């Protein structure tokens, strides 16, 4: 029932891709923790 976890951009990712990944990851964590409580 959890949303899919964002994929890690990998070692060759650009700074923009990494920033996008971290914002997606933060959003994902918010969704997961909100569902639990």
Curated annotation (Swiss-Prot):
It comes from the Eukaryota. Its main location: secreted. CDD domains: PAH. Keywords: Amidation, Hormone, Secreted. Transmembrane segments: none annotated. This is Peptide YY-like. Disulfide bonds: none annotated. GO terms for molecular function: hormone activity.
């Amino acid at each position: 029932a959890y949303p899919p976890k964002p994929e890690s951009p990998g070692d060759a990712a650009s700074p923009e891709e990494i920033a996008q990944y971290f914002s997606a990851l933060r959003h994902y964590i918010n969704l997961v923790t909100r569902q639990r409580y």
